[in-house]
């Protein structure tokens, strides 16, 4: 499983990429691999304000449906509609296939997430 440096990871297998006061959020390589071929993606409304732990969207594969949670408090600025049109993009490039770009409400919440090394150890224990 690929784990990229420079990202933050949640125990629910979401990744967060920080660029200034904005964050990109998607699901990890482990998550897409566990789900299998992704056939449907549901994204939040632009402007939605979500707290850490809230459902960000839904990803469905031929074998399972899984809620995607926001790991941090956010306001959704943009959604990646290309994933709705072609959900398999997540299988092909999980770290390039962000689900939302959002305003990060509280940067200190990033400290509760795992860095790449911690996430790799977490996966070994899964």
Curated annotation (Swiss-Prot):
**Co-factor remark:** Binds 1 lipoyl cofactor covalently.
Q: Does the keyword field hold Ribonucleoprotein?
A: no
Taxonomic superkingdom: Bacteria
**Modified residue annotations for N6-lipoyllysine:** 63
Keyword Flavoprotein assigned: no
GO CC terms, sorted: cytoplasm; glycine cleavage complex
Q: Which family does it belong to?
A: Belongs to the GcvH family.
**Annotated HAMAP family:** GcvH
Q: Provide one Gene Ontology biological process annotation.
A: glycine decarboxylation via glycine cleavage system
Instruction: Describe the protein's quaternary organization and the partners it interacts with.
Output: The glycine cleavage system is composed of four proteins: P, T, L and H.
Q: Which residues form the Lipoyl-binding domain?
A: 22-103
> Which Pfam families does this chain map to?
GCV_H
Q: What is this protein called?
A: Glycine cleavage system H protein 2
Q: Function, please?
A: The glycine cleavage system catalyzes the degradation of glycine. The H protein shuttles the methylamine group of glycine from the P protein to the T protein.
Cofactor(s) essential for the protein: (R)-lipoate
Do you know which InterPro entries this protein is assigned to?
Biotin_lipoyl (IPR000089), GCV_H (IPR002930), GCV_H/Fam206 (IPR033753), GCV_H_sub (IPR017453), Single_hybrid_motif (IPR011053)
Swiss-Prot/TrEMBL keywords: Lipoyl
């Amino acid at each position: 499983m690929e784990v990229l440096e420079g990202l933050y990871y949640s125990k629910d297998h979401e990744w967060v990429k920080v660029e200034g006061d904005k964050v990109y959020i998607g699901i990890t390589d482990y998550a897409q691999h566990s789900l299998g071929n992704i056939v449907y993606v549901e994204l939040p409304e632009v402007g939605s304000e979500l707290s850490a732990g809230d459902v960000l969207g839904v990803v469905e594969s031929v074998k399972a449906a899984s809620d995607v949670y926001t790991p941090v408090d956010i306001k959704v600025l943009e959604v990646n509609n290309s994933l709705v049109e072609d959900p398999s993009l997540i299988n092909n490039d999980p770290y390039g296939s962000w689900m939302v770009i959002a305003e990060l409400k509280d940067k200190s919440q990033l400290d509760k997430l795992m860095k790449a090394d911690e996430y790799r150890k977490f996966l070994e224990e899964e």
